[in-house]
Amino acid sequence: MRVAVFVLSFIWLVNGELLEADQDAVVPGDWTFLGRVGPLEEVELTFALKQQNVSKMEELLKLVSDPDSHQYGKYLSLDEVAALSRPSPLTEKVVENWLRSHGVMDCHTIITRDFLQCVMTVEVAEALLPGSKFHRFSKNTKTLLRSTSQYSVHEDVHQHLDFVGGVHRFPQKRKIVSKGWEGARQAILGYHLGVTPAVIRNRYNLTAKDVGTAANNSQAVAQFLEQYYHPADLAEFMSLFGGGFTHMSTVERVVGTQGGGKAGIEASLDVEYIMSSGANISTWVFTNPGRHESQEPFLQWMLLLSNMSAVPWVHTISYGDDEDSLSEAYMNRINIEFMKAGLRGISMLFASGDSGAGCRHLTKERNTFRPSFPASSPYVTTVGGTSFQNPFKLSYEVTDYISGGGFSNVFPMPDYQVDAVRAYLKSVQSLPPQTYFNTTGRAYPDLAALSDNYWVVSNRVPIPWVSGTSASTPVVGGILSLINDQRFLKGLPALGFINPRLYKMQGKGLYDVTVGCHLSCLDDKVEGKGFCASPSWDPVTGWGTPNYPVFLASLMD
């Protein structure tokens, strides 16, 4: 039997083509090499099949997201999205025949039929994907199977696939976008009394009555790798900080496997602050540690969303990676998945990152800024960060110097933001040199919130001075959930993909942040300074931070 499989496999090996030639296959320094994986060990690979009607879906998303369109808010069901995007019969047949020819039979798909997840031995995987060589790596208690060399597929299959998941991508070195910035920041900013739900609700003008009441409303956070929240931490947090407003102290639903280890500070932060800003609203937690050593947790989360007909309306995610560490094929395909979520009326919020404009060292003499993905996707709403100008009281906000922002090197600037971004580029006198950024790329963030010096309860311990855009993102997500709540009570649809409407509002309902810059490359040309805030939109804080009553009124039609 193995001989027959080999003969069939040999036929398919002729004239292979690289599928993700630009994918960074470098092993991050914090992962330890354990050696080659045995040929009979199993891997699970995810095959992203080419979809149909991508341009049509893009046009439909513009229509359902544009408040001036007669189709505004007329979202599609998952089945309707699946009917549009499903791969062609030829694509399905070619890919399935290719897999069967290698003896790969243990496969399952999802409702949209555009992803195939298949279990096979390493021996078969390496024959299927010439050039791949799987090794085992470890970090703390986590192990992964990955190939550090480029892979190809047969030329007849190449045109039918976007990428194969589970081959190259390591989890991001920082795990997710933000970290609890203790250490040096704690020593400098230790005098701050700290941001709590009461501070958030006061600053953004949320009253005790501004809580959820609609039965059909819901919101969610996503967690990856060893990031888990503990129910006891949430209950303790609400006991300490939830006075003065009606709230829930338990998560409605956990999707995935909730680990039994120590709570992660990021996971605690996400859950505690989406549930205190979007108070009294049903909250889900998507937890994706990866069931198999070869799985990619972020990709598994995307597949879950594509396979569930009923999901929360607002999702906040504090995850990101450098654009230049990912293949364009992968990013373009994930971008389409965000587009499909928008067609369903789902709001996807991503943290902008905690590295300012970032910095990539190209040569000894040349640096550029380093945009982050998915923050740079034109089909998500990206949230930046701010600090109080006066750390002792509720004062106006300035930029948080770590707040991520900039211009994509992969995605062109979408129509909805062209006027705002061009106005910024024309009006600001102290821009960084244009060799550092792409003036025609998707610019982010879109808006912001406080991201500095939060109180969090993790492992039953109250922890101060936690900072990052993983704090601001769930706060904005909760506020959008409150607006959805009011819309549902009036018979209006969910906000969905909010960016086209947000840019048409031109900052209405948002506090404009005009003071401060964020960090970037430490060289003699920019000297650590990236972009700076300015009146109207800017690539540090977007349009600004929420003024809830005005923001709500602006979004209630």
UniProtKB/Swiss-Prot annotation:
**What GO CC terms are in its UniProt record?**
lysosome
Mutant phenotype after disruption: Morpholino knockdown of the protein in embryos results in developmental defects from 48 hours post-fertilization onwards, including reduced eye and head size, a curved body, small jaw, and loss of the swim bladder.
**Cellular location of this protein?**
Lysosome
Q: Which InterPro entries match?
A: Peptidase_S8/S53_dom, Peptidase_S8/S53_dom_sf, S53_propep, Sedolisin_dom, Tripeptidyl-peptidase_I
PROSITE patterns the UniProt entry points to: SEDOLISIN
Needed co-factor(s): Ca(2+)
Where would I find glycosylation on this chain? N53, N205, N216, N280, N307, N438
Q: Which cysteine-cysteine pairs are annotated as disulfide bonds in the entry?
A: C107-C118, C359-C521, C517-C532
Q: Which residues bind Ca(2+)?
A: D512, V513, D538
BP GO annotations: central nervous system development; locomotory behavior; neurogenesis; proteolysis
Q: Which reaction does it catalyse?
A: Release of an N-terminal tripeptide from a polypeptide, but also has endopeptidase activity
Q: Which domain of life is it from?
A: Eukaryota
User: What residue range is the signal peptide?
Assistant: 1-16
Report the PTM annotation. Activated by autocatalytic proteolytical processing.
Could you give the cofactor binding note from the entry?
Binds 1 Ca(2+) ion per subunit.
Q: Does the keyword Cell cycle apply?
A: no
Molecular-function GO terms, alphabetical: endopeptidase activity; metal ion binding; serine-type endopeptidase activity; tripeptidyl-peptidase activity
> Under which EC number(s) is this enzyme classified?
3.4.14.9
Gene3D superfamilies in UniProt: Peptidase S8/S53 domain
Q: What is this protein called?
A: Tripeptidyl-peptidase 1
* Species per Swiss-Prot/TrEMBL record: Danio rerio (Zebrafish)
User: What taxonomic classification does the UniProt entry list for its organism?
Assistant: Eukaryota, Metazoa, Chordata, Craniata, Vertebrata
